[in-house]
Amino acid sequence: MKAVVFAYHDMGCTGIQSLLDAGYDIAAIFTHPDNPGENHFFGSVARLAAEQGIPVWAPEDVNHPLWIERIREMKPDVLFSFYYRNLLGDEILNLAPKGAFNLHGSLLPKYRGRAPLNWVLVNGESETGVTLHRMVNRADAGDIVAQQTVAIGPDDAALTLHRKLCAAATELLGQALPAILEGKTAERPQDHSQATYVGRRTPEDGRLDWEQPAQTLHNLVRAVSDPWPGAFGYAGANKFIVWKSRVRHDLPAAKPGTVISVAPLIVACQDGALEIVTGQTERGVYMQGAQLAQALGLVSGAVISSKPVVAIKRRTRVLILGVNGFIGNHLTERLLQDDNYEIYGLDIGSDAISRFLESPRFHFVEGDISIHSEWIEYHIKKCDVVLPLVAIATPIEYTRNPLRVFELDFEENLKIIRDCVKYNKRIIFPSTSEVYGMCTDKNFDEDTSNLVVGPINKQRWIYSVSKQLLDRVIWAYGDKYDLKFTLFRPFNWMGPRLDNLNAARIGSSRAITQLILNLVEGSPIKLIEGGKQKRCFTDISDGIEALFRIIENKDGRCDGQIINIGNPENEASIKELAEMLLACFERHPLRDRFPPFAGFREVESSDYYGKGYQDVEHRKPSIRNAKRCLNWEPKVEMEETVEHTLDFFLRTVELVDDKNP
């Protein structure tokens, strides 16, 4: 049986050797290049493949059409994945008639996801194991072919458990692979209701929080001990690593973080104390706890912490161009809630940000980005993070004023990008969901989806291609000149202060604002092409929280990333949005102040937008990058967003009426 294998790490070597022992014909092996930032204590899949005379590749994107075609030409009967770090797309999974199988380091359905070996130790589990399962388009969710349980001893650390799992995998594969070869597997579906999920771990996750129970910290030490990066704490500004520990409950309670003893080195925790058996200073050598205490200058009664004691950090300076806009004013509000940020803003108006003008951390100048280029360059040089939020982003303007869209959205923003390169400043650039155009994917993926636009005579695409070209320019500057950047793509953000009713009166607004104007004025709601187009509507509070986390950029996770920010659960057609809005309007306490509902009216897009318009049937984001980089998921349901948005505009109208009797 011909197999194509995707493998890495010791488990990859174990899987390949087991396949060879079982008599499989391995046509090719796909692996990863070694990361220079990792401790390479494990076996090399590439070396094993070369020694066995098997072709081996390490592509950056194995799901690229070129690699899919090469694998198709190999005509594999079966696929195997052994600790390969990237998900395989459906096109690859469907290439093997006998199916695709993955070896996972836990007892599925528990601990789906990344680093299960470390997580079971962190959580103090008494057993784990390995699972061979069929691969489906959902990670770690396919039917189970075989499982092998591994007991976790009280003295097991990451490396000893890793070795146990490798041994268990050898035993499991020795039985399961011949069964697959003979077509005699007994598979069972997973109980998805029992599934648990764990995410990728980083060195920062090894931080010791002395406010936690001693057993919790001991489990963390076991989970990340050598050859993993280790659990760590700080004595003043000096970092130290703990390699081995034990829990002590035989000592008087003390304030968490207090050094109870230096020989042996014992530190008080919330419940019990942690004895540091072995460890090292950040640039030192492996040593016993008592010697570590000497190296750190610790004495009994001293207090150590989970963070370094350092001088007060300067606030991060954030430059927001277009600060009075929908995203800009909400982002300003969120940044001012955190004392770590100072905001510099430019816009042609200040009505939406007037509530911030008295803040000592908010510095505003009224101006136009096409005129105040010297001010902008000076503040790019002065600030740490730049967000150019100025753009014409309403569909009717794409056909009505295409050249103005190009001049502002592309040409003016290109100047800002080049200044960020010149002064080595981080740019967070607002791309758009429009760049995906007429992509046919079910979910638009930042890294794999094609960007599909219409013909030249459909000028509505000038906004999309202007943004797309800027995305590509920024990416190129990042690649060639190390520009620090993150591209974020909002998917139909809604909420208070989205456009205004005056803009809606001339057709230059987003959909919900136009619909609200129709209700307020008692004019028919116009449904373009019947309102069948589907969008995923995202509450502004969800969107801003994601954007705030991009600015935070913990551990640099957002550097060089493209991140969709949208709510795939809030998918609805424009007609459904209008019906939901109407229902909210009819039950609103201010309903009696407005005219009767004038009904729906279907219109052709060319009549409403002009002949240069072309619509998009659906626009649904994949948010895997947002989950991975930001630990973010949207929370607000669509109806709540619609209610808040409607309420804001109706009360705005009320205020205007009160001032103009």
From Swiss-Prot:
Gene Ontology terms for molecular function: carboxy-lyase activity; UDP-4-amino-4-deoxy-L-arabinose formyltransferase activity; UDP-glucuronate dehydrogenase activity
Pathway per the UniProt entry: Nucleotide-sugar biosynthesis; UDP-4-deoxy-4-formamido-beta-L-arabinose biosynthesis; UDP-4-deoxy-4-formamido-beta-L-arabinose from UDP-alpha-D-glucuronate: step 1/3; Nucleotide-sugar biosynthesis; UDP-4-deoxy-4-formamido-beta-L-arabinose biosynthesis; UDP-4-deoxy-4-formamido-beta-L-arabinose from UDP-alpha-D-glucuronate: step 3/3; Bacterial outer membrane biogenesis; lipopolysaccharide biosynthesis
Covalent S-S links between cysteines: none
Active site: H104 (proton donor), E434 (proton acceptor), R619 (proton donor)
GO cellular component: membrane
Keywords: Antibiotic resistance, Lipid A biosynthesis, Lipid biosynthesis, Lipid metabolism, Lipopolysaccharide biosynthesis, Multifunctional enzyme, NAD, Oxidoreductase, Transferase
Catalytic activity: UDP-alpha-D-glucuronate + NAD(+) = UDP-beta-L-threo-pentopyranos-4-ulose + CO2 + NADH; UDP-4-amino-4-deoxy-beta-L-arabinose + (6R)-10-formyltetrahydrofolate = UDP-4-deoxy-4-formamido-beta-L-arabinose + (6S)-5,6,7,8-tetrahydrofolate + H(+)
CDD domains, sorted: Arna_FMT_C, Arna_like_SDR_e, FMT_core_ArnA_N
Site (Transition state stabilizer): N102
Binding site for NAD(+): D347, D368, I369
Binding locations of UDP-alpha-D-glucuronate: 393, 398, 432-433, 460, 492, 526-535, 613
Enzyme Commission number(s) of this protein: 2.1.2.13, 1.1.1.305
Listed GO biological process terms: lipid A biosynthetic process; lipopolysaccharide biosynthetic process; response to antibiotic
Region feature (Dehydrogenase ArnADH): 314-661
Oligomer status and interactors: Homohexamer, formed by a dimer of trimers.
Stated role: Bifunctional enzyme that catalyzes the oxidative decarboxylation of UDP-glucuronic acid (UDP-GlcUA) to UDP-4-keto-arabinose (UDP-Ara4O) and the addition of a formyl group to UDP-4-amino-4-deoxy-L-arabinose (UDP-L-Ara4N) to form UDP-L-4-formamido-arabinose (UDP-L-Ara4FN). The modified arabinose is attached to lipid A and is required for resistance to polymyxin and cationic antimicrobial peptides.
Protein name, per record: Bifunctional polymyxin resistance protein ArnA
Organism from which the protein derives: Klebsiella pneumoniae (strain 342)
Gene this chain is encoded by: arnA
